[in-house]
Design a protein with these regions (language model features):
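Small/polar loops that bind or transfer phosphate-bearing groups
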Residues: 19, 75, 182
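Conserved acidic residues
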Residues: 38, 69-70, 116
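Structural signal for interior beta-strand "rungs" in well-ordered beta-sheet cores
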Residues: 101-209, 213-216
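Short alpha-helical
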Residues: 22-23, 79-82, 197
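Hydrophobic, well-ordered beta-alpha structural blocks that scaffold small-molecule cofactor pockets
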Residues: 1-61, 66
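Phosphate-bearing ligand-interacting subdomains
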Residues: 45-107
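Short glycine-/acidic-enriched loop or helix-start segments at secondary-structure transitions
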Residues: 26-28, 82-84, 202
Length: 217
């Protein structure tokens, strides 16, 4: 684990989750006893003031109202993942405020490295020498093998398998159920379709899908 990341010192740390979306709902299951959720932060007027599972949805001012709270920022979907870096940077937070949330059932090797603002969901396996960048979200039951490198801002769906020495560039989206052959490189900003089998390198910004995966469009 990277030095300087906040850990709960003998008690649960207060936490805000941005935005109030599907990833945030998934994160609720991952908090365990390490965090105490204050609520959600969102920019959508129709969500503000509502409660979700007993937690209120606040405007961005909440980030300043609770200056000691850690923040988990998990925007992004298959249609919006390429703008998530701007959304997170737009929060203008001290990097030390970003949380790292790992579901208690996930298995992360002590020889792996996780960045800031990383969400690792239930059943994920991350093995030796894997390096997960900042602002990465990994959905349930994905397996990331030895020496894999995941770039900042990347989202990985559920039940994906990344074989050894795969390199995923920043700002990618890997759809649920995809498999990536060992040693391949996925270029920055690429989209891998659901259930795809990737047996060739993927160019930056490309969208590929199928078995084997081929460029679309």
């Amino acid at each position: 684990m990277r030095a300087g990341l906040p850990e709960p010192p003998g008690g649960a740390r207060p936490l805000l989750i941005f935005p109030c979306n599907g990833n945030a709902l998934e994160a609720l299951d991952c908090l365990g006893s390490a965090f105490r959720l204050i609520g959600f932060v969102d920019d959508s007027p129709e969500k503000l003031g509502r409660t979700l599972h007993g937690h209120e949805v606040f405007p961005r001012a909440a980030l300043a109202d609770w200056p000691d709270a850690l923040v988990l920022a998990v925007p992004g979907s298959p249609t919006s993942f390429r703008v998530r870096s701007g959304l997170i940077d737009g929060l203008a937070l001290d990097p030390a405020r970003f949380a790292r949330v790992v579901h208690p059932s996930a298995r992360v090797s002590p020889l792996a490295s996780l960045g800031r603002n990383v969400l690792v969901m239930a059943g994920v396996v991350i093995t030796s020498n894997a390096v997960i960048g900042d602002h990465v979200c990994i959905l349930p039951n994905t397996v990331i093998h030895h020496d894999v490198r995941i770039g900042d801002w990347t989202l990985i769906g559920s039940n994906a398998t990344l074989a050894g020495r795969v390199t995923v560039g920043p700002g990618c989206y890997l759809g649920s159920g995809c498999s990536v052959m060992n040693g391949l490189t996925i270029g920055a900003g690429a989209l891998i379709g659901i259930g795809s089998t990737v047996i060739r390198p993927v160019s930056p910004g490309a969208t590929v899908a199928g078995n084997p995966a081929r460029p679309l469009g």
